[in-house]
Every structure is written in structure tokens, then in C-alpha cells.
């Protein structure tokens, strides 16, 4: 699949190769191109509901619209692959006074496919600017000293070059008005994915029995083969023969590839007797422990997986911030991340916010474990991966329902169109026994309160850094007082495909600015640190310095 511009990266640029070649599942092989995957119901599954924190589609859209009725500032990041996973620590700076504004986690590995976003990933830094007493007007002054700085740290703790990613920019988003919409009902399908915490004892037993059988299956529909699609052993190859991980992340086809991947595993379990779909773990709600389905140690195939290629078991080493909100907000860290993603009205803008929100679960569940969720190469061997991605896919389905309610496109994308029409490996492979996935292997109250306020975001431009890492950042006043601004996770590995977002990942630093008695008019700094999953600091140059973006609230008047 060579191209004139990047022959060595043909698999990434032209589809999802892992699901096309040597795929024993004809269902996933038949639908292995992204543009066939917008309609998840065509794959034969549905969710028990698409509510978000008790809000149906109509109420969720109303809450989002209210949130957008204020001016906001974002840090805009143009992200791309940096060959490793890393944390990008953002700082908002007013001259030399820098304050932590948040952290972005980039998922990647040395052998990843090249990727980049074609628009900004946005991080809300409105609150950080407020806390730093920086007026919005200051953002537009010719001699403004307001800027963003980042420190990039890989998962092994090494500090990466801060110029590994473009310097984030400040983005101003004015308040939006309200538009009346209608609700459209949807039919349900027989195969239902349920909340993991609502499963009955008989459903738990049924799922465990099915997974035991899949794990014992050594064929192309078995656990080891399907798990290998995501990372090790490497299944995709450049034209020169170099192998790389087939997982697509940091690119527009991330949701499509993983939707098909979930279908592949779900069909394997269904073939072994599963009566319901893979349950979803709704990590946007506050939780203090992992789901019981995966923590019960006895006679439980969901407790861990075995990795034949490494001759070891998967392990988990949860970080404290998984259960204790690092930002100490009113709602959970994950709720805030996904709520902002759902605000987006364009698929390409939604995708980056959505993907980065999902990354933190990988990093904070796996922690420093070399064979766990935080590693791109082995994450898919942990059964918890599939509960996590069932919820990730459900969030995409929620956004699609919102788009239909808004009267906006919900099953198409206008960025990187070429990728949406190319087969995704290994689903499109002639060896894929799953005809469904083969056919779809191409692709064309708290919330209201938040939305009433001005917001400031730190924007990070993310790309592959070759490993997984946590990105943390502080917001600092010019007098030296600093407070934690935020954290996010970069998922990656040595063999990941090259990737880079072409837009900024946005992180809300409004609350931190308020804590520091600052606003958008004040001078402040953003100090970023990046730490790998092994605890080693990474150079901040792995990622460009973040930019600050302001989103004014309802009625905010801004003169330039």
C-alpha cells in the first residue's frame, strides 16, 4: 500500500490493515474500512441506553448548549505521532509567571503508524486565566506576554524535547446561542451491551463461561489472535518489511478501528455462547474500585489474561488518581473530559477530545505494569480492555445520537477523507471468518452550571512519542505560587504507528486559575512535566508548549 509521499507508512494512511490480511473472521473482514462503521447497529449490537449521567439525548443537548453560552479560551494543540507514549504538562504563562493548566496523555510507540490530526485538540483554560487574573482582552494585545509552555514526559519518566510537538496556540471561542431541536426514537437490537455494574449473576456466569472458551481457542477466532491485532506480536508491515503495531490511534479512524475490534471479540464470545454483548464500564461516573467482574480472583477469566508471545500474565497497577480526582472537581475527572467532547459538533473535533479522554483509563489502570493497560503493545490482552472500549464506543454512540438530535451530520467526517475509504487491517483480510466486520472494514445539572461560566483551556498538540506517559502541568503566578492545573495520558509503545493530531487537545484550567486568584487578564505560566509509566521524567520538548484558549460565557463582551 505505498504512497508517493510516505511509502513506509502506507498501512496507516490507507486504512486499517490488521483487519484485512490473514483475518479468520469474515464478519470483521467484510467491513474492515472505516466508512462502514458509523452505524454500529449494523454490526448486530446495541446499548441498553445512551443516557449520560441521567440525561437523555434531549436534556444532554440542552445542557451542552447552556455550557456553550459563555466565552471560553482554549489552548489549541496540533497533534501528531512522536513514537512513544507521554504526558504533556501544560502551563499558562504571563511573562515568567507560569501556572499548571493540565496534562495531555499521548499514546504511541516507536513502530506506530504515522498520524496527525488536521485540526486542534482543545483544552479549556478559561478558569486558569480567571484564577491568574488574566483578562480576555489581554489575549489580543500585540505586546501580550501570555503564552503556553509544555513539558513532555514519557511513560518511563524521561523528559522529551518540548518541540516534539508544535507549540500550542490560544483559541478564543465566543458564546453560542440556543437552537430548538427534536428527539428521534431508535429501534433496539437483540444483542445488548449492558452496564457492567447492572449484570445479573446468571449474566456474569454466561460471560465468564464464554470468555473461558474464547481464551482456550487457539484458532483465528481465539483470544490470542484477536488480542494480537492491537499490538504484539506485530501484524502490520511497511513496504520495506518492518513490522509495526496495527492499532490505529491519534488519527481520525481511531473510533472506527476500535468499534470493529470490539465487534471481532464480541462475535468470538457470541460463538462460544455469550447471550449479551460485551458490557461497558461507565468510567465517567465516580468510582472507588474496578468493576467486580474483573477483580474477583477465583475462577474468573476477566481477572487477567495470558500473553502467549511474552509467556506471562497481564497485571494492573492502578495509579491513585484513577480513584481520586487529581483536579478535585465537583464531578469526576472523566466526566469533565467527556462532557466537553460531547459539546463538539464536528466529528473531527469530537474525535480528538474523545480519544484523549479515553487514554487516561489506559494509563491509570495499568500504571507501571509492563504488561497491562498502559502499554500499547499488551493492553488488549487484559480483559478489562474490552469493558473499557465498550464504554468508549458507547460514548461515540451517544455523540452520534446528539448529532442526530441537533440535525447535524452523525455518520460522516470531513477530515482525512482518504483514510475513511481505505480497508482497515486485519478486518478486510480474506482470512477473516467474520463476514460482518469484513463488510464494514471501510468508513466514510452540573453540566449546566459549568456551561454558565467563562472557561480557559490549555491546548496541547499531541503526537506519538514511542511510549505511554502521564502529562501533568501546573499553573503558576508570577510571584512563584503554583497549583496543579491538570493531567492527561499519552498511550503508546516502541512499536506503535507514527501519529500526530492536527488540532489541539483542550484541557480546562479554569478552576486552577480561580484558585490562584487569576483570570484571563493576568500574567501566568503553564509548567508541564511528562512522566513515563516507569516513573522516569521525559523531556518536555516531546510536545510543543500548550496554548491558552478562552471561551467566554453567556453575555460576556469582549473588545479587541
Curated annotation (Swiss-Prot):
InterPro entries: Di-copper_centre_dom_sf (IPR008922), Haemocyanin_beta-sandwich (IPR028999), Haemocyanin_C_sf (IPR036848), Tyrosinase/Hemocyanin (IPR050316), Tyrosinase_Cu-bd (IPR002227). Its cofactor is Cu(2+). Binds 2 copper ions per heterodimer. Disulfide bonds join 1-11, 93-98, 236-246, 348-415, 476-482. Residues 1-184 are annotated as: Unit G. Gene3D superfamilies: Di-copper center containing domain from catechol oxidase, Haemocyanin C-terminal domain. Keywords: Copper, Disulfide bond, Glycoprotein, Metal-binding, Oxygen transport, Repeat, Thioether bond, Transport. There is a cross-link at residues 12-14, 247-249 (2'-(S-cysteinyl)-histidine (Cys-His)). Cu cation A binds at residues 230, 249, 258. SUPFAM superfamilies: C-terminal domain of mollusc hemocyanin, Di-copper centre-containing domain. GO terms for molecular function: metal ion binding; oxidoreductase activity; oxygen carrier activity. Cu cation B binds at residues 358, 362, 389. It comes from the Eukaryota. Glycans are attached at residues 142, 240. Residues 185-560 are annotated as: Unit H. Hemocyanins are copper-containing oxygen carriers occurring freely dissolved in the hemolymph of many mollusks and arthropods. Belongs to the tyrosinase family. Hemocyanin subfamily. Decamers of large identical subunits (390 kDa), each containing 8 globular oxygen-binding functional units. This is Hemocyanin, units G and H. It comes from Sepia officinalis.
